[in-house]
Every structure is written in structure tokens, then in C-alpha cells.
Amino acid sequence: MRPLLIAPGRFISQLCCRRKPPASPQSKICLTMARPSSNMADFRKCFANAKHIAIISGAGVSAESGVPTFRGAGGYWRKWQAQDLATPQAFARNPSQVWEFYHYRREVMRSKEPNPGHLAIAQCEARLRDQGRRVVVITQNIDELHRKAGTKNLLEIHGTLFKTRCTSCGTVAENYRSPICPALAGKGAPEPETQDARIPVDKLPRCEEAGCGGLLRPHVVWFGENLDPAILEEVDRELALCDLCLVVGTSSVVYPAAMFAPQVASRGVPVAEFNMETTPATDRFRFHFPGPCGKTLPEALAPHETERTS
């Protein structure tokens, strides 16, 4: 059996945010390349020849749909940044506050729709599937907009806002209720002057499995928690097989996902970054296309003149 590229035993699997990659014995293989190209015609040649395309997406794709990113200036909920609340320690200390934060995010998403970037990816996947080619989306986003756009081959490595996990019995279940429990109705306002609701724990979302009734938590990966090893193995298989990789709307500072594309690039596979600005990983990639993904991706993923037509 071949060794995994990103298996937990060889690389970090814990969710964390860093400006520089973690030290590892393999880091020396990710050599800095020549300045990446922004030549769309050259990228389109790679796209036309690719049989297995991996697309790694981050918050920048959904930002164009109006989804808060909780990054940079103005990236606060009340006086907190996401990294202050998206931790197991924060949930243990104040589950009411954390549930208010996620209730706000769930409610925001009800009015958001996929943008042209999401749709370009989904349409490309469907079109290439009919040609016997594969597109897989590996997303760090928890908003389900790729799913809503129609993407089928989807790995949501950080989970989703619309699933819960019981802290007692471990049951994972879809949950699209609005509000998720009566006590959260009208709660979660993001303004800094808003006071915490201080909802009693027994009024927060509870497990409905027979005989359980345990406290529910969002089924997302929090900072300091490990990603699901089974999902990491799926990611590894896809990245080991891909012959073209796109990195779209991601800052390349949240690990372990920030390692994925540089590892693909280290074996000579073309990697194209689509982002508003450069990232710590940009110089490792063959292509970089600045600008909104909703503008660059439709052109990049449009049918190529060499594609079969029905």
C-alpha cells in the first residue's frame, strides 16, 4: 500500500491557523518556483488535458455571496473573532455564547445563494463527468453553497453548519430547523453592544435519540481539533491521482488544508491559485489569477474547444 501524502501520522491533522507552514521532514520538497503565470491560455491548455481535477476552496469563494469570513478588519462577531469561539474550550466554558454564534451563521446562510464561482465549478464537474473526467471539490467552507450549486463530488473537510453532533452519544444528524431550538429564536445578533443571551444549558439544542437528550454541538471542526482521518484519507487519494489542482478563495494559512496544494505542486502537477491577493503559498504554484473567483473561474472552467459535445 502506498504511503499517504497527508496522513495524520506524517503531517498535522489538527485545525490551526499559521502564517508560515509547520516544520516537517517533507517541507524541503516544496521548493519555491519561478513567479507564477497569469496566462489564461496556458492554463486552459492544462485544463483541456486534465483527466482528474482537484479543486480546493476556501472562504473567499463564499465571501462573494455575502457570507461573513470573520477574517481581517471587521471580521468580528460582537467583540470576538471566530478563533475565539470556534474551539472546544469556548464551548465548554460558554455553550450558550457559542450556540448564539453558530445560530447567527446558520440564519445568515438561509438568504445566501451560490455565486458564479460556485456555479462554474458545479457546471464544470457535471460536464466533465459526462466525458469520463473527474472533478472533486475539497472545501474548507461549512456553508453548503457548493452543495447548493449542484456539486456532487464534495469533501467538506471542516464539516457543515447544518449538521449537529451529540456530545453524549455521538450521533450526527442533519438539522435545517430555524431556529434550531426555541431558546435561540431572535438571538445571535452580531453587533458589539449586544449582550450574551446566557441561555440555560438545558434549553440549548438537545439530542433527540431515544434515552439520550445530550447537549448538541455544531458538527464542525474547531481550532485545536483533528480532522476526520477517514476524510483525510479520501483527500489524500484524490490529491495523489489529480493531474490538475485549483486553489480558489483560500488564504493558505489554515492547516492542514494549506499543505494540500503545495504537496501536489511538489510532484510537478500544475496548480492554479484563484484569489483576490497573493498568499504564503503563491510562489509554489504554476499559475496565479488575481481577482474575484466569480469572475475568473467562469472563464477558466468554461468548455474548451477540444471538448466533445453531445
Curated annotation (Swiss-Prot):
Phenotype of null mutants: Mice are born at an abnormal Mendelian ratio with the number of live-born pups reduced by 40%. Surviving mice display a global protein hypersuccinylation and hyperglutarylation in both liver and skeletal muscle, while global lysine acetylation is not significantly impacted. Mice display elevated levels of blood ammonia during fasting, but otherwise are metabolically similar to wild-type. No overt phenotype observed in mice on chow or high fat diet, suggesting that Sirt5 may be dispensable for basal homeostasis under these conditions.
Single GO cellular component term: mitochondrial inner membrane
PROSITE patterns assigned to the protein according to its UniProt record, in alphabetical order: SIRTUIN
Active site (record annotation): H158
Chain positions recorded as Zn(2+) binding sites: C166, C169, C207, C212
One GO-annotated biological process of the protein: protein demalonylation
Annotated effect of mutating H158Y: Loss of enzyme activity
Residues that, per the record, bind NAD(+): 58-77, 140-143, 249-251, 275-277, 293
EC class name: transferase
Cofactor note (record): Binds 1 zinc ion per subunit.
InterPro entries: DHS-like_NAD/FAD-binding_dom (IPR029035), NAD-dep_sirtuin_deacylases (IPR050134), Sirtuin (IPR003000), Sirtuin_cat_small_dom_sf (IPR026591), Sirtuin_class_III (IPR027546), Ssirtuin_cat_dom (IPR026590)
Keywords on record: Cytoplasm, Metal-binding, Mitochondrion, NAD, Nucleus, Transferase, Transit peptide, Zinc
Transit peptide: 1-36
Subcellular location, principal: mitochondrion
UniProt binding sites for substrate: Y102, R105
Entry's localization field: Mitochondrion; Cytoplasm, Cytosol; Nucleus
Protein family (similarity comment): Belongs to the sirtuin family. Class III subfamily.
Function of the protein: NAD-dependent lysine demalonylase, desuccinylase and deglutarylase that specifically removes malonyl, succinyl and glutaryl groups on target proteins. Activates CPS1 and contributes to the regulation of blood ammonia levels during prolonged fasting: acts by mediating desuccinylation and deglutarylation of CPS1, thereby increasing CPS1 activity in response to elevated NAD levels during fasting. Activates SOD1 by mediating its desuccinylation, leading to reduced reactive oxygen species. Activates SHMT2 by mediating its desuccinylation.
Domain notes: In contrast to class I sirtuins, class III sirtuins have only weak deacetylase activity. Difference in substrate specificity is probably due to a larger hydrophobic pocket with 2 residues (Tyr-102 and Arg-105) that bind to malonylated and succinylated substrates and define the specificity.
Name of the featured protein: NAD-dependent protein deacylase sirtuin-5, mitochondrial
Species: Mus musculus
